[in-house]
Design a protein with these regions (language model features):
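N-terminal secretory/targeting leader peptides
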Residues: 2-19, 24-122, 132-365
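An N-terminal domain-start capping segment
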Residues: 127-131
Length: 365
């Protein structure tokens, strides 16, 4: 059975499972939706965000609109979740938009751009800077309505089997990265790889990979990457944030009562806050454990940061010149990014530096 016909075959249409009620009943309908998400079990925070979302929707609607995670709803191999949802495979699903950047390059702005925004800045652009409106306009052609639903925050720069001392060390480096980071690495002479989470540790161990960037300390610790690639570099300039998105099939969305739509929007915002805060709360302890287990932290050489920044700007400009849809989003995102970077240098970054001077960890070094 084709996935796009799943809901129709259930006799429900893309609006989801609306149970029949007598004509005299005017209350909100009873609706049940299956949810698709492919987060591996090791990613407990992202899976926890799914639970926050479904619980919140049920609570806000008095259990009349119920969303259940359905592990049998899986996109085809290499099919982005947003395409799966847009084609009718599920009424709702969670994923990372930059997985579909090969077909729609501007979707990188819905997840992460090298040297771009951090998690707070991403939320500011999405909710108050016009970003969410632009993403919804972009994804309307894909029959998807998107919502921010979580963010990993700043990530680590990657796990390497050997030290990286200069930009030339990136030449021929088989480096697992995601999204636009692959284009930047390619400009630096590296060989970007798309190895999935399940094969990461094995690929590093048997030298199929030289390095891998996954997420932050909490997730990386659970995957055990430090045990086979001990050199961990920072900052994570490739992904200063990584936003996850909730995708709702547009036809299913249009059939929802207004109060149910609002419940989804509120629940996604709650999950977005919960996931981001959870990562911030657990990453420090995970970083300590990583170093206690032998991880070797190293700052990226300034030469590499400068070369990567230059490559990023070149790639952004090239995409903007070649793609009108990318250019439209970029023209909003770039001035917002530049203004945020200036403000954060004056306020947030200077405060962080001064506050860290008084921290117990700093005073012992």
């Amino acid at each position: 059975m084709k996935r796009r016909n799943l809901l129709t075959a259930m006799g429900l249409g893309l609006g989801g499972a609306v149970l029949a009620t007598p004509a005299i009943a005017q209350g909100p309908p009873q609706i049940r939706w299956p949810l698709a998400a492919t987060f591996p079990r090791e990613l407990d925070i992202l899976n926890g965000g799914v639970e926050v979302l479904v619980r919140r929707v049920a609570r806000l609607t008095g259990n009349r609109f119920v969303i259940d995670r359905d592990s049998s709803l899986l996109p085809m191999t290499d099919q982005p979740m947003l395409d799966f949802v847009g084609s009718g495979g599920a009424p709702i699903g969670l994923g990372a938009s930059y997985q579909a950047m090969d077909r729609e390059p501007a979707l990188v702005f819905d997840t992460s751009v090298p040297f771009g925004l951090n998690a707070r800045q991403q939320n500011a652009w999405m909710y108050q800077g016009g970003g969410l409106m632009l993403m919804r306009e972009l994804l309307a052609d894909h029959d998807v309505v998107p919502f921010p639903v979580g963010n990993t925050g700043s990530q680590l720069g990657g796990w390497f089997r050997r030290e990286i001392r200069a930009a030339q060390d990136l030449n021929g480096l088989k480096f697992r990265v995601s999204g636009m980071a692959a284009d930047v690495l390619r400009r630096l002479g590296g060989q970007p790889q798309r190895t999935g989470h399940a094969g990461l540790r094995t690929a590093l161990e048997d030298k199929t990979l030289d390095a891998a960037a996954w997420a932050g300390p909490h997730d990386d610790l659970r995957l055990g990457l430090h045990k086979v690639a001990p050199y961990c570099y920072y900052p994570g300039f490739l992904e200063g944030n990584a936003q996850l998105s909730c995708y709702v099939n547009r036809h299913a969305w249009d059939r929802l009562p207004p109060e149910y739509r609002e419940a989804v929007e509120v629940a996604c915002a709650d999950a977005n806050l919960w996931v981001t805060a959870r990562y911030d709360a657990l990453n420090p302890a995970a970083l300590k454990q990583l170093t206690a287990e032998g991880a070797i932290l190293r700052p990226f050489p300034l030469e590499i940061l400068r070369a990567a920044h230059r490559a990023t700007e070149e790639q952004l400009e090239a995409l903007a010149s070649a793609n009108g849809r990318f250019r439209k989003v970029y023209s909003s995102w770039k001035p917002f990014r530049d203004a945020q970077h200036l403000w954060f240098r004056i306020a947030e970054n200077s405060f962080d530096r001064s506050a860290s001077l008084q921290s117990p960890e700093t005073s012992r070094n």
